[in-house]
């Protein structure tokens, strides 16, 4: 019996029960499923900051997730994007799971930092450079089997593995992916950087699906900040029309095409908009295996995080979702 107690509790349920503890609300079984945690659009207030740094942090530390993904917007839109605030929030997020936090930027911490309503305004391009230095100048120190990679020149785009499940982040933000309300920077320069980032995202997405065909992969999990379903019209952005267009439609079409070719479960996780919902029809008839999770946050009350059970062998329900503290399941989108 003592020998069995030393066996990792991530083994099948019969052995897990011998380890002396109760199973969490969403259980993790070895090899066939895994459980991850996402958080974002948080904190937007002092109350949410306190909740994240106390109750949420304790719950995350006790749940033994392999990592945490923060899907951006780590501050409220009305807070000035100062070095001090961004550094404090970076430290708070890192402390949720030291050395195991993946973060993709949100519009609140760079594209929207030039708003006239703010007490202190910043160039959005300067804030993006600051974020890249603050969060991504040093790669995470992860085990080799995670196959962790960052995209050259766009280090916020990351890719890693857990067994046969592939994860990646794409730097796509609100404000029409940074194409609207360029108030303090040269618009042509800002749009040129948006175009470069868009191209990098498309390359990173294609590379991830290529990798999934070359290595055993049973599911792909993609995280962005932006709600790709919340675009402006249906017209794609072009060099001759870079702003009065839908900044998400091109990557959305690419994602559906790649997911359809992959055939196995694909989940897009994002924040940016308020509904807490799981969209089983996001891929449409073209890619019924493509799901979309608008995760908890964006003034949802109370402050919480979203845990996801990934069970790729269940084609009808490959993703089971509920909040960490209150076990609230999402509605349909």
Q: Over which residues does each language-model region extend?
A:
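Structural recognition of the beta-strand scaffold that forms the well-ordered cores
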Residues: 35-39, 66-76, 100-105, 109-112, ...
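Bacterial N-terminal signal peptides
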Residues: 10-22
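His/acidic metal-ligating clusters that form di-metal
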Residues: 58-67, 95, 168, 184-281
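Extended active-site neighborhood of metal-dependent phosphoesterases/phosphodiesterases
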Residues: 80, 85-200, 283-312
């Amino acid at each position: 019996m003592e020998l069995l107690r030393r066996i990792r509790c991530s083994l099948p349920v019969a052995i897990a029960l011998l380890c002396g503890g109760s199973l969490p609300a969403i259980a993790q079984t070895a090899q066939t499923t895994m459980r991850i945690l996402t958080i974002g659009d948080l904190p937007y207030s002092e109350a949410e900051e306190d909740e994240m740094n106390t109750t949420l942090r304790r719950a995350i530390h006790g749940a033994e997730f392999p990592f945490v993904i923060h899907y951006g917007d780590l501050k409220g839109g009305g807070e000035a994007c100062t070095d001090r605030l961004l550094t404090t929030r970076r430290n708070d997020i890192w402390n949720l799971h030291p050395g195991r936090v993946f973060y993709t930027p949100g519009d609140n911490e760079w594209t929207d930092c030039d708003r006239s309503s703010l007490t202190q305004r910043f160039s959005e391009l300067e804030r993006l450079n600051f974020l890249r230095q603050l969060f991504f100048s040093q790669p995470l120190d992860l085990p080799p089997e995670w196959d962790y990679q960052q995209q050259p020149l766009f280090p916020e785009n990351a890719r890693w593995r857990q067994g046969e499940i592939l994860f990646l982040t794409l730097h796509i933000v609100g404000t029409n992916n940074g194409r609207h309300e360029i108030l303090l920077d040269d618009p042509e320069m800002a749009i040129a950087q948006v175009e470069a980032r868009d191209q990098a995202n498309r390359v990173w997405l294609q590379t991830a699906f290529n990798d999934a065909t070359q290595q055993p992969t049973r599911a792909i999990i993609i995280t962005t900040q932006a709600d790709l379903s919340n675009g402006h019209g249906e017209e794609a952005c072009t060099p001759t029309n870079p702003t009065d267009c839908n900044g998400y439609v091109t990557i959305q079409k690419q994602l559906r095409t790649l997911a359809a070719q992959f055939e196995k479960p694909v989940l897009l996780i994002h924040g940016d908009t308020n509904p807490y919902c799981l969209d089983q029809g996001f891929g449409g008839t073209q890619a019924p295996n493509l799901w979309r999770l608008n995760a908890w946050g964006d003034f949802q009350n109370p402050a919480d995080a979203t845990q996801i059970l990934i069970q790729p062998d269940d084609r009808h329900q490959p993703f089971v979702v509920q909040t960490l503290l209150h076990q609230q399941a999402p509605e349909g989108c």
